[in-house]
C-alpha cells in the first residue's frame, strides 16, 4: 500500500454501532452490489483492480486468482458498517493470499469532527516542515560554480569586447555611477547593482563599489566561496578592470559576470593597429587624443635563424590617433632575421631599434658570463681600468710590506738569538744545558769575555785607548797645577805590589794572545774577579755575593748584551735597564728583599729560581760544567776541571789558568772570523 503524497492516512474504524449506523444502508447496498459486479466481470484476469472513484480514497487492489472467490466488502469510508474492518483485515491477512493495494490520498473533506482535527494536524506538520526547510536554506550560503566546458577558453574572455559593449563596460567597471539613486535601488548582495554602503569598506568610493571591495555577507563568516564568486582570474585582460596584487579582477554582481562570459571571440581575430587604437584609458570615459600614441599589441613570430636581431618598434611620429578612444597597451616586439651588426642601430625611416640576438643552438651555457666580462676583440688595446690598477697597487704594496717584515724579522731573530737560546735553556734539564754550553764555542768565549773582534774593532779600540790616555794626562796635569796653586795636599793612589805583578802578567799574556786590555779598567776587573777578597772564596762558591758585586756583574753583563740585544726594560726604582722582562722581575726583588724560592735541603731562600737550582746542585755534588772539549780539527783543549755551576766555570776562564785553557778555542774563532773578512 503506497500513498502518492508520502503521508500516511488515518482510517478510523470503530465497533460502535451508533457511529456505524449514521450512513444510509441503501447506499451501502448499492455500492456493494456495484462492486460485486465489477469483481465478477474481471474474475477471468490474473489480477483484479477495484477503482473506488466515488470515494475520497482510490484503492487499487490486486490479488491472486486463487483467492478471487472470497467475498470482500468494498465500502471504505469513515462511516462504513462493521464489515469494513473485517474485510480490510481479510485483505491484509497473510492467510488470504498475497495482495497489493495502491491508495492515492486525494482529500479528506468529511463533515465529522475527528476528520477535521486530522486535517489541521497535517497542515500544522506541513507548515513546520516548510519552516525548517526555509531555515536550513537561510543558513546555507548560495554559491555559484562556474565550470569550464570543452568549448570554453580563457582566451575568449581575454580578447577585447566589441564596440557595442565597450562603452557600457568601461563606464560600469571603472567610473563611478553618476545616475545613482539610493531609494530606487536595492542594497542586497544578490541585486543587480549592489551599491551597498558599509563602514567595512573604504570611504573613497561613493556609492560603494564592490569591484574594489566586495560587501561582507551577514549569512557567512568570511566564507571563501563568496570571494571566489566575485573574483575572476584574468591574468592580463583588456577590459581595463582594476587588478589586485594577486592578479584577480573583481565583479560586483551576476550580470557583470554574464557580460564577461558571454563575450566569446576566436583566437584568430587579432586586432590590428587601427582597431586597437580605438581603446582608451577610460577612467572618466573620455581621454585627450594628443596624450596617447599609436601603440599596438602584436607578436610576430618568425623562425629562429642562425643570426637574428630583435626589432623594438618605437613610434616616432607624434600625430594623434584618428580615433577618439585609445588605450595604452604593450608595444610590438617582433623577431626578424638580419645578417650583420653588433650594436643596436636605429632606423630613422620606420623608427625601429635593431638588437642582435644570438642563436640559441650555438649559444652554450658556458658563455653566460660573457655579459659580465668584455670581449677580447673589443678591448685588445685598452689599458686596465682604475679599479684594476688600484687592486694591483694594493697587491704590490702588500708584497713590499711582506718583504720588509721578513727582513725585520730576520734581523730581530739574529739579535734575539741569545735571548731565545737562554729561554730555551730554562726549559731544558740541567744536564742538557751543561752539554749545550760545552758544545757552544761562542757561549764559552762570552763567559770568558774573550769574543774575537775584527780589525776595525781593534783599530777603534786603539783609537779610543789613545784618546783616553791623552785625556787622562791632560786632566792630571791640570789637576796638579790647580792643587799646587791652591796649596792642597793630595795623595796619589797606591797600588799594591801583588796587584801590579798580576796586571803585568796579564799584560804580557794579552800581548801573546792578541788581547787588548785597558789597565785603567782593571779596578772593575779586580772587583769582578775578587782578587782582594781571598777570604770569600767559599762564599763565592756558595753564591753569597754582596749586592754591590752583583750589581757590578749585572752591569758587565748588560754591557756585553747591549751589543746584540737592546735594553728596553728599565727599573722604576734605580733606572737600570735589562734586555729581558725576567731579569727585570728578578732585579725588582732585590729592592724589596723578596726571596720566594727556598732550598728544600737547607732552607736557604733565593730571589731567583735558577739560583736555587744551582744551590741545590751543590748539595747533590753534581758537577756538570767541564773546562775542556775538542776543536774542529780534533785537538783537545782545556784542563778538564768540573764545576757545579756555569758562573763558576766562567770565573775559572777569567783566571790565569783559565785563560790558558780557553786560548786554543779563542784562536780558532779569531782565525775563522779573519778568514771570513778577507
Curated annotation (Swiss-Prot):
Q: Where are stretches of biased composition, namely Basic and acidic residues?
A: 429-446, 457-467
Renumbered to this chain, region (Disordered) spans 1-50, 159-195, 401-486
Compositionally skewed regions (Polar residues) per UniProt: 1-21, 166-195
Zn-finger (C2H2-type) residues: 569-591, 597-619
Where in or outside the cell it occurs: the entry states:
Nucleus; Cytoplasm
Q: Does the keyword Zinc apply?
A: yes
GO MF annotation list: cis-regulatory region sequence-specific DNA binding; DNA-binding transcription activator activity, RNA polymerase II-specific; DNA-binding transcription factor activity, RNA polymerase II-specific; RNA polymerase II cis-regulatory region sequence-specific DNA binding; sequence-specific DNA binding; zinc ion binding
Q: What else is known?
A: Present with 1160 molecules/cell in log phase SD medium.
Question: Per its record, how is this protein called by name?
Answer: Transcriptional regulator CRZ1
Instruction: State the species of origin.
Output: Saccharomyces cerevisiae (strain ATCC 204508 / S288c) (Baker's yeast)
Query: Which gene is the coding source of this polypeptide chain?
Result: CRZ1
Amino acid at each position: 500500500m503506497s500513498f502518492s503524497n508520502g503521508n500516511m492516512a488515518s482510517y478510523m474504524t470503530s465497533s460502535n454501532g451508533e457511529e456505524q449506523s449514521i450512513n444510509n444502508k441503501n447506499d451501502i447496498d448499492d455500492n456493494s452490489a456495484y462492486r460485486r459486479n465489477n469483481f465478477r466481470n474481471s474474475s477471468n484476469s490474473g489480477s483484479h483492480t477495484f477503482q473506488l472513484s466515488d470515494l475520497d480514497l482510490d484503492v487499487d487492489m490486486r490479488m491472486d486468482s486463487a483467492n478471487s472467490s472470497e467475498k470482500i466488502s468494498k465500502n471504505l469510508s469513515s462511516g462504513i458498517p462493521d464489515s469494513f474492518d473485517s474485510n480490510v483485515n481479510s485483505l491484509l491477512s497473510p492467510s488470504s493470499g498475497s495482495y497489493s493495494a495502491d491508495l492515492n490520498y486525494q482529500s479528506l473533506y468529511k463533515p465529522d469532527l475527528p476528520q477535521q482535527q486530522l486535517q489541521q494536524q497535517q497542515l500544522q506538520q506541513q507548515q513546520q516542515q516548510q519552516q525548517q526547510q526555509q531555515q536550513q536554506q537561510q543558513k546555507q550560503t548560495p554559491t555559484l560554480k562556474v565550470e569550464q566546458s570543452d568549448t570554453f577558453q580563457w582566451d575568449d574572455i581575454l580578447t577585447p569586447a566589441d564596440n557595442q559593449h565597450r562603452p557600457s563596460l568601461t563606464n560600469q567597471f571603472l567610473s563611478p555611477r553618476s545616475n545613482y539613486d539610493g531609494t530606487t535601488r536595492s542594497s542586497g548582495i544578490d541585486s543587480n547593482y549592489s551599491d551597498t554602503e558599509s563602514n567595512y569598506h573604504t570611504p573613497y568610493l561613493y556609492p560603494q563599489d564592490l569591484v574594489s571591495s566586495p560587501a561582507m555577507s551577514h549569512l557567512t563568516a568570511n566564507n571563501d566561496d563568496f570571494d571566489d564568486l566575485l573574483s575572476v582570474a584574468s591574468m592580463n585582460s583588456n577590459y581595463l578592470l582594476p587588478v589586485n596584487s594577486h592578479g584577480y579582477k573583481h565583479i560586483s554582481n551576476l550580470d557583470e559576470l554574464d557580460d564577461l562570459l558571454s563575450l566569446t571571440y576566436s583566437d584568430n581575430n587579432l586586432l590590428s593597429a587601427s582597431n586597437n587604437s580605438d581603446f582608451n584609458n577610460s577612467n572618466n570615459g573620455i581621454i585627450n587624443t594628443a596624450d596617447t600614441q599609436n601603440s599596438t599589441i602584436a607578436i610576430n613570430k618568425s623562425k629562429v635563424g642562425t643570426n637574428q636581431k630583435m626589432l623594438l618598434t618605437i613610434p616616432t611620429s607624434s600625430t594623434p590617433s584618428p580615433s577618439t578612444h585609445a588605450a595604452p597597451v604593450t608595444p610590438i616586439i617582433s623577431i626578424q632575421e638580419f645578417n650583420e651588426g653588433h650594436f643596436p642601430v636605429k632606423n630613422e625611416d620606420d623608427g625601429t631599434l635593431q638588437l642582435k640576438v644570438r642563436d640559441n643552438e650555438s649559444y652554450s651555457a658556458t658563455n653566460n658570463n660573457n655579459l659580465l666580462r668584455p670581449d677580447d676583440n673589443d678591448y685588445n688595446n685598452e689599458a686596465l681600468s682604475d679599479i684594476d690598477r688600484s687592486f694591483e697597487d694594493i697587491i704590490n704594496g702588500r708584497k713590499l710590506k711582506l718583504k720588509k717584515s721578513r727582513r725585520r724579522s730576520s734581523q730581530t731573530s739574529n739579535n734575539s738569538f741569545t735571548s731565545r737560546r737562554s729561554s730555551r735553556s730554562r726549559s731544558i734539564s740541567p744536564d742538557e744545558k751543561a752539554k749545550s754550553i760545552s758544545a757552544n764555542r761562542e757561549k764559552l768565549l762570552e763567559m770568558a769575555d774573550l769574543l774575537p773582534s775584527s780589525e776595525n774593532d781593534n783599530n777603534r779600540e786603539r783609537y779610543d785607548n789613545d784618546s783616553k790616555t791623552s785625556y787622562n794626562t791632560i786632566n792630571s796635569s791640570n789637576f796638579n797645577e790647580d792643587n799646587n796653586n791652591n796649596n792642597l795636599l793630595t795623595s796619589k793612589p797606591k797600588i799594591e805590589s801583588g796587584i801590579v805583578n798580576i796586571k803585568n802578567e796579564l799584560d804580557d799574556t794579552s800581548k801573546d794572545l792578541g788581547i787588548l786590555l785597558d789597565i785603567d779598567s782593571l779596578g772593575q776587573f779586580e772587583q769582578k774577579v775578587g782578587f782582594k777578597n781571598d777570604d770569600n772564596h767559599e762564599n763565592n762558591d756558595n753564591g753569597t755575593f754582596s749586592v754591590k758585586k752583583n750589581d757590578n756583574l749585572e752591569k758587565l753583563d748588560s754591557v756585553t748584551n747591549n751589543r746584540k740585544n737592546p735594553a728596553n726594560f728599565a727599573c722604576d726604582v734605580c733606572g737600570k735597564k735589562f734586555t729581558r722582562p725576567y731579569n727585570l722581575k728578578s732585579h725588582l726583588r732585590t729592592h724589596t728583599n723578596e726571596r720566594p724560592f727556598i732550598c728544600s735541603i737547607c732552607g736557604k731562600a733565593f730571589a731567583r729560581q735558577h739560583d736555587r737550582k744551582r744551590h741545590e746542585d751543590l748539595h747533590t755534588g753534581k758537577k756538570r760544567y767541564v773546562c775542556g772539549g775538542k776543536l774542529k780539527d780534533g785537538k783537545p783543549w782545556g784542563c778538564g776541571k768540573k764545576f757545579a755551576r756555569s758562573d763558576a766555570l766562567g770565573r775559572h776562564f777569567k783566571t790565569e789558568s783559565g785563560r790558558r785553557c780557553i786560548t786554543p778555542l779563542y784562536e780558532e774563532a779569531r782565525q775563522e772570523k779573519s778568514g771570513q773578512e778577507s
